[in-house]
Amino acid sequence: MTSAVPYDPYDDLDNNPFAEPQEEDSEPAATTTDGSSSMSEERVGTEQTAASVQDNGTANNIQNGLGEEGNATRSKTSNEHNENQQPSQPSERVILPERSDEKKKYTLLAKVTGLERFGSATGKKENPTIIFDCSTNLPTFRKQQYKNVKKSYEEFHQLFKYLNVAIQESFVPTLPSAYTTFGINSEEDRMKVTRNFQLWFNRLSQDPLIIRNEEVAFFIESDFNTYTPINKSKSLASGLKRKTLKQLAPPYDEITELAEFRPLVKSIYVVSQSLQEKLLRVSRNRKMMVQEENAFGQDFVNLDEHNKLYRRYGKILTAVGDIDSIIATMDMATLYDGLEWIVRDAYAVKEALTNRHFIMRNLVQAQQNSKAKQEQARRFRSRRDINPMKIDEALRQLKAAAKNEQVLTLKLQRITSNMIIERKQWISWYEEWIRSSIKEFTLRKIEYERKKLTLLERVRSDIRKADENGGLSRLGRHAVSNNNSDTSQTLKGDSWTGESNRKSQIPINKIAHTEFDDELFTEDDGYNSQDSDTTSLNARHAASLLGMSTK
């Protein structure tokens, strides 16, 4: 009579008297990438919950792979039971407690109050001192208010380098440039650098992962020009290894938003660099043209002995050349400098997404390693004369591989969840910044082009007097008065475009009066007064001579 239960030849493998008991407790796996955050205590409870759930699932998988296999009915029942006990995916509250904790809303507010430049010429340009006030409710700070905090640009750079490597979940905003094309001694440079650092602080304070890092507290509370990163951070890959890994095809990314985001950021990076090169070339050519315009105007000034109109016209041409030089500088200071910040930030975002690809590739390797350890353990089960020590070693390796896979899985989930949120924030910042840069570039260009028009209108009446018909005979505008010397920029609008919009008197005065009015009018008035005195003296002398001749 045969038994209804099939015979299992490996049923006695689990009765190993030398095997160590299975440990049910496990360490939390969902840790931050930097390992130095001072806010980790508040995440321990939630992370241990998620880690224990996944550890139990991992232990069940190990036991299912190496535990005894009963008959077909028992195995089917156990599989159904395991499917019912399958752990669920951790929620966003578990993965990112910094963003989901509504009870603890930590803030960090900073207001830039000044900018100082001292030291050598290189130090003044590349290492200015930023002065700011700070208020916060973070527990990592010793107090809530900080006044007149002074930090050099080099200290800001040290902080950025640490945060960019330590916090792999975030797109750490890059520092603005330490100087602008306006020149370090100009008021425009001071105002723009101050405004850019204020924008940088605003972006930094919007990221809860950054402000909760204890290195930010060390930075603000340290003395002036003494800060160096306290904690150490190590990049995933650098140097030749990083260049080699970037040549490989990126792993499959099931998150469509991030899979399409990196090519977009790279295209922004490449296009912005191309625009910078073209703007630089245009600016250089314009400055070469300015030299020719100044030489051309000086040649007319040298002809003043023939007619005073040449002197006035030459001075106007020289002033027009100077305005073209200002326009070339404004193009660089507005649009070129704006694109420079976009290039830096796009590169940092692109490298952060590349680090995520490295973690995805490490996770794939960890999954393959875990599967190989499971296959090795199953092969050990098929042998009856296997050494129990080898079985224990295989179990330990399998558990270590499963734990490594679990750590990388939670790490990737944390990075992915936070990058999806910051993707929208970065795109909105990029659109707003490029819009403001183009607006400033356009308004400055219009302003100085109108000033150039105002200068040319100064000699319009003199040039028309050179023609008996007023210089308008070939244009067919006979109704226009020959003595019209009014400027085209009025409160009613621009007469060249036919617009009749109401405008403020302040911008009209700014356009109708240029930086060269004092020089032009002073020299012209002096020339006219000297010329009139000479003319009157010659008339008296002529009259006296005529009177003497009649006697």
Swiss-Prot record:
Location (main, coarse): membrane
Disruption phenotype: Leads to hyper-fragmentation of the vacuoles upon hyperosmotic stress.
Residues recorded with modification Phosphoserine: 544
Intracellular or extracellular location(s): Endomembrane system
Domain PX stretches: 108-227
Chain positions covered by the region annotation Disordered: 1-100, 474-504
Keywords: Coiled coil, Membrane, Phosphoprotein, Protein transport, Transport
Membrane topology qualifier: Peripheral membrane protein
Cross-referenced CDD domains: BAR_Vps17p (cd07625), PX_Vps17p (cd06891)
GO cellular component, one term: retromer, tubulation complex
PANTHER family listed in its UniProt record: VACUOLAR PROTEIN SORTING-ASSOCIATED PROTEIN 17
Record-stated family: Belongs to the VPS17 family.
Miscellaneous comment in the UniProt entry for this protein: Present with 7380 molecules/cell in log phase SD medium.
Role summary: Component of the membrane-associated retromer complex which is essential in endosome-to-Golgi retrograde transport. The VPS5-VPS17 subcomplex may assemble onto the membrane to promote vesicle formation and is required for recycling the vacuolar protein-sorting receptor. Required for the sorting and delivery of a subset of soluble vacuolar hydrolases. Required for retention of late Golgi membrane proteins and vacuolar biogenesis. Involved in vacuolar fragmentation during hyperosmotic stress.
Protein name in the entry: Vacuolar protein sorting-associated protein 17
Annotated organism of origin: Saccharomyces cerevisiae (strain ATCC 204508 / S288c) (Baker's yeast)
